[in-house]
Amino acid sequence: MSKVAIYPGTFDPITNGHVDLVDRALNIFDRIVVAVSTAYGKKTLFDLDTRELMIKEVFKDNDRVKVVSFEGLLVDTAVKHGACAIVRGLRAVSDFDYEFQMSSMNNKLNSDIQTIFLTPSEKFSCISSTLVRAVAIHNYQRVGEFVPECVFDRIELKYSKD
């Protein structure tokens, strides 16, 4: 039986840090389901379908990665896709409090699904989707080193019109 983990997020947009985390999680798990959240209450740069399409493009050559969108409870989506674990990244101590609370709630909802925390590779430790969006607003051309090429192309299309 293969070990499957789910990696949830808004991914608005997916960054090289996210991609690195998936690649590293594949050293632990046989398959990773990247689960793109509907982002309740957040104003997103890209709509759900576009975010899902970009991530599928990023991982198109990796048959060990499946990309899905979801709404509702993460643990229900994890069960639906046969995941035994939730993978989350911790960039800084400030991430821990929120992630610990989420992990505790997910464990209460389904104690069969474990949460695994991975720290980013050092070169990706300061990258976040929020920071990429903030930089892109002022100078989209500066975000190319932080996101996959297909994502940069979408950012360029969005901001070069302005």
Swiss-Prot record:
It catalyses: (R)-4'-phosphopantetheine + ATP + H(+) = 3'-dephospho-CoA + diphosphate. The keyword Cell division does not apply. ATP binds at residues 10-11, 18, 89-91, 99, 124-130. Its cofactor is Mg(2+). SUPFAM superfamilies: Nucleotidylyl transferase. GO terms for molecular function: ATP binding; pantetheine-phosphate adenylyltransferase activity. Keywords: ATP-binding, Coenzyme A biosynthesis, Cytoplasm, Magnesium, Nucleotide-binding, Nucleotidyltransferase, Transferase. GO terms for biological process: coenzyme A biosynthetic process. It is an enzyme of class 2 (transferase). Pathway: Cofactor biosynthesis; coenzyme A biosynthesis; CoA from (R)-pantothenate: step 4/5. It is found in: Cytoplasm. Its EC number is 2.7.7.3. CDD domains: PPAT. The record marks 18 as: Transition state stabilizer. One of its GO terms (cellular component) is cytoplasm. Substrate binds at residues 10, 42, 74, 88. Belongs to the bacterial CoaD family. Reversibly transfers an adenylyl group from ATP to 4'-phosphopantetheine, yielding dephospho-CoA (dPCoA) and pyrophosphate. Homohexamer. This is Phosphopantetheine adenylyltransferase. It comes from Francisella philomiragia subsp. philomiragia (strain ATCC 25017 / CCUG 19701 / FSC 153 / O#319-036). The lineage of its organism: Bacteria, Pseudomonadati, Pseudomonadota, Gammaproteobacteria, Thiotrichales. The gene is coaD.
